[in-house]
A protein has these predicted regions:
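Inter-domain helical "communication" segments and dimerization helices
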Residues: 1-14, 24, 102-108
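Basic, amphipathic alpha-helical hairpins
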Residues: 5-17, 37, 41, 59-68, ...
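Extended hydrophobic-aromatic, low-complexity segments
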Residues: 15-20, 34, 45-48
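Append "Primarily bacterial transcriptional regulators
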Residues: 20-28, 33, 37, 71-80, ...
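Terminal helix-turn-helix DNA-binding modules in bacterial transcription factors
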Residues: 39-80, 102-108
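…primarily DNA-binding HTH/wHTH and HhH modules…
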Residues: 87-108
């Protein structure tokens, strides 16, 4: 799992980075990677990658990284469609990224 996290830290911001690229970086085929990752995390590989990106985005919002707007954050964490990012973030955290950002700003 350490190797997976090392690769994720280096590649999460690349919008072209996905399941196949993770498998290639680890020297595994997709099937083996999927089985190993599911055993460790309980998640399909694509969802693991997406959740990793969403966690980084959430931290960026909390840390108010360079006053970035939501679209900039979406691109920064490897999403190439800000609307899809918003849908994923809302599904994951139960609140839109904009609302989450507003809440963080109010608490500051």
């Amino acid at each position: 799992m350490d190797e997976v996290m090392e690769v994720m830290e280096k590649k999460y911001d690349d919008s072209e980075f996905g399941v196949q690229e993770l498998a290639d970086a680890l020297g595994l085929n997709r099937s083996v990677l999927s089985k190993k990752l599911a055993a460790e995390t309980g998640l399909p590989t694509a969802q693991f990658i997406r959740n990793y990106r969403l966690d980084i985005a959430k931290r960026m919002i909390i840390d108010n990284v360079a006053n970035r707007n939501i679209t900039e954050i979406a691109y920064r964490v490897g999403f190439n469609d800000p609307k899809y990012f918003t849908r994923c973030f809302t599904k994951q955290y139960g609140v839109s990224p904009s609302s989450f950002k507003d809440t963080q700003e109010e608490e500051s």
